[in-house]
């Protein structure tokens, strides 16, 4: 991923990355990618930065890129943790339903235990993956469209009702557009999928993230 292709707008107070800053599954190959991402992310002239890792970010999971290195660069790393900024409570969690052998993955039957840890008073929920049915459509191997978000996460979001939920993980592909912001009639929450590369075009920015105002 060439993060330098992203255009960071001026005048924003906080930038959030919701994971998959890297590509390699092998943590030893992943390490150099992650360190390059941190170098780039740290130079963004925005006063506050949050990073929630994704399933691709294996070098953090395996301890090759330690928390101290990230936070020493002015980046807040959230792994099932909260930070309060200007009175708003942000909760970051990296887990997604298991698919292959990646980091921070849990079987769908037990992943609700992770979501139970999301505080009821969360204002901004930062996950790596989407809730079921919201900006989570993709093509299955049989070329049929399927929704791959987490139903247990969707259930938890309806209870917590954060103002905003941020995620990535499921990319846009072919004629399906997942990157963007959506409001859903059954939720009081606004949803943002900030995946910046389309499936099949990894390394090429096809979406520049989302800019959202919240108070």
Regions found by a protein language model. Give the residues of each.
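Short, solvent-exposed loop/turn segments at secondary-structure junctions
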Residues: 2, 22, 57-58, 95-98, ...
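Binuclear metal-dependent hydrolase catalytic cores centered on His/Asp/Glu-rich metal-binding motifs
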Residues: 88-124, 142-155
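Short glycine-/acidic-enriched loop or helix-start segments at secondary-structure transitions
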Residues: 26-28, 60-63, 100-102, 134-137, ...
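Core catalytic region of metal-dependent phosphoesterases/phosphodiesterases
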Residues: 2-85
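Short, conserved loop/helix-junction motifs that constitute active-site signature segments
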Residues: 8-10, 41-46, 68-72, 118-119, ...
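Active-site neighborhood of phospho(di)ester-bond hydrolases with catalytic His/Asp-centered motifs
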Residues: 15-20, 48-55, 78-79, 124-128, ...
């Amino acid at each position: 991923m060439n993060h330098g292709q992203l255009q960071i707008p001026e005048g924003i107070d906080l930038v959030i990355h919701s994971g998959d800053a890297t590509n390699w599954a092998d943590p030893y190959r992943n390490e150099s990618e992650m360190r390059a991402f941190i170098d780039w992310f740290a130079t963004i002239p925005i006063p506050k930065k949050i990073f929630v890792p994704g399933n691709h970010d294996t070098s953090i999971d395996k301890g090759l890129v330690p928390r101290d290195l990230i936070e020493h660069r002015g980046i807040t790393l959230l792994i099932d943790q909260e930070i309060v900024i200007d009175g708003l409570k942000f909760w970051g969690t990296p887990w997604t339903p298991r698919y292959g052998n990646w980091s921070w993955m849990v079987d769908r039957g037990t992943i609700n235990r992770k979501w139970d840890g999301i505080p009821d008073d969360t204002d901004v929920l930062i996950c790596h993956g989407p809730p079921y049915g919201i900006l989570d459509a993709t093509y299955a191997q049989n070329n049929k469209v399927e929704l791959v978000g987490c139903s247990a996460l969707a259930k938890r979001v309806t209870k917590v009702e954060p103002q905003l939920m941020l995620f990535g993980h499921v990319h846009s592909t072919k004629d399906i557009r997942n990157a963007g912001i959506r409001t859903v009639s059954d939720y009081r929450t606004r949803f943002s999928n900030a995946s910046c590369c389309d499936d099949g075009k990894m390394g090429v920015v096809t979406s520049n993230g989302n800019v959202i105002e919240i108070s």
